[in-house]
């Protein structure tokens, strides 16, 4: 806790509520209420928007390290003023911190878990030391490298709600020693456990029976798993490490894991929220991971094996909670077993769905044919160019040898290149909305830079993370609603055409994009505002400037709050039906029905109701409007290249959509932009072909007919009904186009 605490008083907040109207999108308030509004037990309801923003801003501003001592009145006054400006910015929905910050900032959970403010992480799958971390197995020295460590890091961060990118490239996997032992695993449970019968069905055995048959065995490792996140991680670490001589010096090969203390299915999880899965998914995971490693005795684990272990962990984390586990596996570009691993449909449906898979390349790579073929069939692999990430900030600023030399991978959505153990740290501004709300964009982006800088002063649980964060202090200031903003301010899209050119290295003909000069000037000016803000704040705090500063995040759920296009992506359609799914007991449903929204039972999930909300994109009727269904694959690549060149010194998250007749352009375009785009992924455009599709394009008349049926304001109706409930979330919502990121 800081010695001095900055707070926002009620008089100020009441004044802002009187002066500013939040720019809610059509889906905005409902999405907020079911995703980011925390339960207030003393008021027997969830937060209102002003209460959420107050919590979030106070949680952030008090991370300023000067408050740990006795700061001057000048510092207190300036930080109070900054907190007020941030409150205005976020309350108006001109900008928001990441969904993770909206959910966690200012809570007791944040104070206990410094990691909790960062959305996503990256870890290299190779033996590493645990170091001075909150989780260290008792059977090894904290400085000793262990095969289990990166898997423990991934398991821990996933359970704290973060996404994790992980690298299984050859250089990492080759460092894992050969598997020395098969492990004979037993999982036991006490008859008194509420999970007893269900656990026996998935392979556990009666504890008393096991003890009767195995008394006096001294070659057994017995571990009673505590009902904690750390307990789950340590049990899995013990299982993995017993297979290797370096971490099993006694060469004991029988392991007994006692799950009797683990809370049953449906019990509440305090802190992050959600409900417990019971021990059953954990039991299945233990046996599955043990089988993967046992099959490699006398050999080394492969990239596919390591990815399977990570996927099995991810599957377990998902099992009992609405929130999704987000993983990105990064493999070597010539590892065909890795590239094709999802073609095994049985394993895909069992656990390999748990990660999006990408390959690491450099700018000399030219074998895009097999990659394009995979993309056409299942949308994978994505591409991550580590050479560009290590040696470039913005492409416009040219080659800077080793400017980010520790980079080994990326977060699951690909917008931040990361070193081992490093997290992304995000905040986004909606320039189209901010201008409408009267903001000077440079001030808005400067506030964003300072917000993210403070997050780097959190207390981090893992030593590997603390070290790299203190070195890099990487921030990710993003902009979203980019298509809305550029079309509004320029009158047209930023790519104004293409001209014939030749590839300087190969001589091949290419179509070089032409960018609006004013568009370049707009984003360049904002980039330099972020750099200046970070430099000034770093000097105030006496720390290094951030190694990189800007990005474009995919921004699915957060963009819905303000009703803008998602990140750099084009609106899915000018007019569409957005379907969102609610638990059938949700008290928001009567309010939605009363206001005229169409609801129907979900055809995929029991006890779930599908609500249809008609949406109109900003500028849908403009002759220069383009949607994901009409914009060309070439223009999407060119737009991503524009942002990577002039705005983002990290990377740009983009899922390029393509029509069937454009698939032959994938490989040539990937090659054309090999010196510009740091990471990208592609998916076929499906339109509304699936039943109860999340997004279904419609025409203007259908939209107007739907809107005419809607009467009343859901927020007002819901508040008048006064039937709020605790612990409800939207069902199976997606935070980005690729589905790679956690919800919050």
UniProtKB/Swiss-Prot annotation:
UniProt-listed SUPFAM superfamilies: PFL-like glycyl radical enzymes
Disulfide bond residue pairs: 120-424
Enzyme Commission number: 1.17.4.2
Bilayer-spanning residue ranges: none
Provenance organism: Lactobacillus helveticus (strain DPC 4571)
Signal peptide start-end: none
Gene name of the encoded protein: rtpR
Keyword set, alphabetical order: Allosteric enzyme, Cobalamin, Cobalt, Disulfide bond, DNA replication, Oxidoreductase, Redox-active center
InterPro entries referenced in this protein's UniProt entry, alphabetically: RdRp_reductase_class-2, RNR-II_ins_dom, RNR_alpha_hel, RTP_Rdtase_AdoCbl-dep
Domain of life: Bacteria
Gene3D superfamilies reported for this sequence: 3.20.70.20, b-12 dependent (class ii) ribonucleotide reductase, Chain A, Domain 2, b-12 dependent (class ii) ribonucleotide reductase, chain A, domain 3
Adenosylcobalamin-binding-1 as annotated region, ranges: 570-631
Active site: 413, 415
MF annotations from Gene Ontology: cobalamin binding; nucleotide binding; ribonucleoside-diphosphate reductase activity, thioredoxin disulfide as acceptor; ribonucleoside-triphosphate reductase (thioredoxin) activity
Catalytic activity from the UniProt record: a 2'-deoxyribonucleoside 5'-triphosphate + [thioredoxin]-disulfide + H2O = a ribonucleoside 5'-triphosphate + [thioredoxin]-dithiol
Residue ranges of the region described as Adenosylcobalamin-binding-2: 690-729
Segments of this protein annotated with the region Effector region-1: 148-159
Subunit and interaction comment: Monomer.
Protein name listed in UniProt: Adenosylcobalamin-dependent ribonucleoside-triphosphate reductase
GO biological process: DNA replication
Activity regulation, short description: Allosterically regulated by ATP and dNTP.
Residue span of region Effector region-2: 169-318
Family that this chain belongs to: Belongs to the class II ribonucleoside-triphosphate reductase family.
Co-factor requirement: adenosylcob(III)alamin
């Amino acid at each position: 806790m800081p010695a001095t605490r900055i707070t926002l008083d009620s008089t100020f907040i009441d004044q802002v509520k009187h002066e500013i109207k939040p720019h809610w999108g059509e889906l905005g308030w409902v999405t907020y209420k079911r995703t980011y509004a925390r339960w207030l037990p003393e008021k027997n309801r969830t937060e209102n928007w002003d209460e959420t923003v107050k919590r979030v801003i106070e949680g952030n501003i008090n991370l300023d390290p000067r408050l740990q001592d006795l700061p001057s009145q000048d510092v207190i006054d300036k930080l109070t003023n900054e907190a007020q400006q941030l409150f205005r910015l976020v309350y108006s929905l001109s900008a928001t911190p990441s969904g993770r910050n909206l959910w966690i900032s200012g809570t007791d959970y944040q104070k206990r878990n410094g990691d909790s403010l960062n959305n996503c992480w990256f870890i290299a799958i190779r033996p590493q030391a645990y170091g001075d971390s909150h989780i260290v197995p008792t059977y090894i020295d904290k400085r000793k490298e262990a095969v289990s460590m990166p898997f423990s890091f991934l398991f821990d961060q996933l359970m704290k709600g973060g996404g994790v990118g992980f690298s299984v490239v050859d250089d990492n996997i080759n460092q894992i020693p050969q598997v020395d032992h098969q492990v004979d695993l037993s999982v036991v449970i006490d008859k008194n456990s509420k999970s007893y019968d269900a656990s026996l069905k998935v392979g556990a055995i009666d504890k008393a029976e096991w003890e009767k048959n195995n008394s006096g065995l001294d070659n057994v490792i017995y571990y009673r798993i505590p009902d904690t996140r750390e307990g789950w991680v340590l049990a899995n670490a013990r299982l993995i490490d017993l297979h290797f001589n370096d971490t099993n010096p006694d060469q004991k090969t029988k392991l007994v894991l006692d799950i009797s203390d683990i809370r049953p299915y449906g019990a509440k999880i305090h802190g992050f929220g959600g409900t417990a899965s019971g021990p059953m998914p954990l039991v299945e995971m233990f046996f599955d991971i043990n089988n993967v490693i046992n099959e490699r005795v006398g050999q080394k684990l492969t990239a596919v094996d390591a990815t399977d272990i990570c996927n099995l962990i991810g599957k377990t984390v998902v099992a009992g909670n609405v929130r999704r586990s987000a993983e990105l596996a990064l493999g070597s570009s010539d590892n065909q077993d890795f590239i094709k691993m999802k073609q095994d449909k049985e394993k895909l449906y069992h656990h390999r769905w748990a990660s999006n898979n990408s390959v690491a390349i450099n700018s000399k790579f030219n074998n895009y044919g097999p990659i394009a073929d995979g993309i056409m069939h299942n949308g994978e692999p994505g591409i991550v160019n580590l050479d560009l990430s290590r040696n470039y900030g913005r492409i416009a600023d040219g080659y800077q040898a080793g400017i980010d030399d520790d980079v080994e991978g990326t977060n699951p959505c690909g917008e931040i290149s990361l070193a081992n153990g490093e997290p992304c740290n995000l905040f986004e501004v909606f320039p189209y909305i901010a201008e409408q709300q009267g903001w000077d964009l440079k001030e808005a982006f400067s506030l964003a830079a300072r917000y993210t800088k403070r997050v780097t002063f959190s207390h981090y649980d893992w030593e590997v993370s603390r070290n790299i964060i203190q070195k890099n202090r990487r921030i990710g200031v993003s902009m979203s609603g980019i298509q809305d903003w550029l079309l509004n301010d320029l009158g047209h899209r930023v790519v104004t055409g293409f001209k014939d050119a030749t590839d300087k290295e190969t001589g091949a003909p290419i179509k070089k994009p032409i960018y609006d000069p004013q568009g370049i000037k707009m984003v360049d000016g904002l980039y330099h505002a972020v750099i200046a803000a970070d430099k000034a704040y770093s000097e105030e705090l006496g720390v290094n400037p951030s190694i990189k500063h800007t990005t474009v995040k995919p921004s699915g759920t957060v963009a819905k709050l303000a009703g803008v296009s998602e990140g750099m992506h084009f609106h899915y359609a000018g007019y569409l039906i957005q379907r969102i799914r609610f638990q059938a007991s949700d008290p928001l449903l009567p309010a939605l029905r009363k206001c005229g929204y169409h609801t129907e039972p979900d055809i995929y999930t029991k006890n779930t109701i599908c609500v249809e909300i008609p949406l109109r994109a900003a500028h849908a009727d403009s002759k220069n409007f383009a949607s994901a269904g009409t914009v060309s694959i070439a223009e999407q690549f060119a737009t991503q290249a524009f942002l990577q060149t002039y705005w983002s010194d990290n990377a740009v998250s983009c899922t390029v959509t393509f029509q069937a007749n454009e698939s032959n352009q994938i490989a040539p375009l990937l090659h054309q932009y090999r010196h510009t785009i740091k990471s990208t992924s592609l998916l076929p455009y499906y339109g509304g072909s699936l039943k109860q599709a999340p997004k279904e394009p419609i025409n203007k008349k259908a939209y107007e007919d739907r809107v005419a049926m809607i009467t009343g304001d859901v927020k007002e109706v819901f508040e008048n009904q006064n039937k709020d409930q605790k612990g409800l979330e939207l069902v199976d919502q997606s935070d980005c186009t690729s589905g790679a990121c956690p919800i919050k």
